[in-house]
Amino acid sequence: MADIDNKEQSELDQDLDDVEEVEEEETGEETKIKARQLTVQMMQNPQILAALQERLDGLVETPTGYIESLPRVVKRRVNALKNLQVKCAQIEAKFYEEVHDLERKYAVLYQPLFDKRFEIINAIYEPTEEECEWKPDEEDEISEELKEKAKVEDEKKDEEKEDPKGIPEFWLTVFKNVDLLSDMVQEHDEPILKHLKDIKVKFSDAGQPMSFVLEFHFEPNEYFTNEVLTKTYRMRSEPDDSDPFSFDGPEIMGCTGCQIDWKKGKNVTLKTIKKKQKHKGRGTVRTVTKTVSNDSFFNFFAPPEVPESGDLDDDSEAILAADFEIGHFLRERIIPRSVLYFTGEAIEDDDDDYDEEGEEADEEGEEEGDEENDPDYDPKKDQNPAECKQQ
């Protein structure tokens, strides 16, 4: 068996040498064509493919043979470093616990501002002229005369229109402006979300397991009797004993929704379908009515239940993964910065961040391409001494 493997390896090495010889003897398009042809021939050879697969499997099983080759006394020292790493993870967990305490502390300071936001949106409080003053960047160079003219025109338009009170459809607009949320909102959800007055986040009390609750406050409506719909997210804030090195801060481990008390005929999470069935023998036809689930934002409050075994099917895992992402996004971005998602400014900032990364990547690609196409380019000249990188 070893002789066969050695023979296959020799053939593979010889074929690779042939590619190198072709590249040395010929240049230009002919070299590329012949190299491609030789590659195709090699990939059609089952012995070569088997040898390549065996080599790749070996690399996967032993990502670094260096560690295995270390003397026993050195391996002991590596184990000592791993134990230190576990202690680092435990300290990191303490750090995140204190961060959670700070979030709870500052949530109290933010709340008066969020309460004022709620009052303005829902026409409970009318902001003063001073509170409404805002100077967008694009108005920096506009003359006072033009500003006054624009103000007069705006006042005329306001006189012609009836005051809509507050900021209508504020949260619905926020949801529709954010792709992550707009994908959840169906057309039949929109009339209900027009009644959404506020979204709040509540953090777990000190000494309690880390968690947070999203509260969706609704005004009285024709769809359900609940005033508040809730979604609770449970978090793990300490390293897993079975895999301590995977700890990278608190992570959402599960969530619980709430029961929605729908009024008769208003449950948008269900739909009724009718099917016609034909009897095979008699040929008679009957109509069967069936109630099935329906796509809706309000399915957000009925997440899949995780069994005690923790095993979920692929669909449930995907739903929960998306659910956790949405819960985190609402807590970290939407609730504290809702006005910027209402106006679209936060979305533009997010897009700019992605554009800058893309432009940098494109520029790097262009530079690399120029170096490869430069006949005088010597890669050895560009090699820098090894640098110490901080993680």
UniProtKB/Swiss-Prot annotation:
A motif (NAP1L motif) lies at residues 125-150. Residues 1-32, 132-163, 345-391 are annotated as: Disordered. Keywords: Acetylation, Cytoplasm, Isopeptide bond, Lipoprotein, Methylation, Neurogenesis, Nucleus, Phosphoprotein, Prenylation. Residues 11-28, 132-143, 346-376 have a biased composition (Acidic residues). A motif (Nuclear localization signal) lies at residues 273-279. The modification 5-glutamyl polyglycine is found at E359, E360. It is found in: Nucleus; Melanosome; Cytoplasm. Its main location: nucleus. It comes from the Eukaryota. One of its GO terms (cellular component) is cytoplasm. The keyword Acetylation applies. GO terms for biological process: nervous system development; nucleosome assembly; positive regulation of neural precursor cell proliferation; positive regulation of neurogenesis. Residues 1-10, 144-163, 377-391 have a biased composition (Basic and acidic residues). The modification Phosphoserine is found at S10, S69, S143. A lipid is attached at C388 (S-farnesyl cysteine). Residues 389-391 form a propeptide. Histone chaperone that plays a role in the nuclear import of H2A-H2B and nucleosome assembly. Also participates in several important DNA repair mechanisms: greatly enhances ERCC6-mediated chromatin remodeling which is essential for transcription-coupled nucleotide excision DNA repair. Also stimulates homologous recombination (HR) by RAD51 and RAD54 which is essential in mitotic DNA double strand break (DSB) repair. Plays a key role in the regulation of embryonic neurogenesis. Promotes the proliferation of neural progenitors and inhibits neuronal differentiation during cortical development. PANTHER family: TESTIS-SPECIFIC Y-ENCODED PROTEIN. The NAP1L motif is required for the histone chaperone activity. The acidic domains are probably involved in the interaction with histones. Homodimer. The dimer binds strongly and sequentially to single and double H2A-H2B heterodimers. Interacts with ERCC6; this interaction increases ERCC6 processivity. Interacts with RAD54. Interacts with SETD1A. Belongs to the nucleosome assembly protein (NAP) family. This is Nucleosome assembly protein 1-like 1. It comes from Bos taurus. The lineage of its organism: Eukaryota, Metazoa, Chordata, Craniata, Vertebrata.
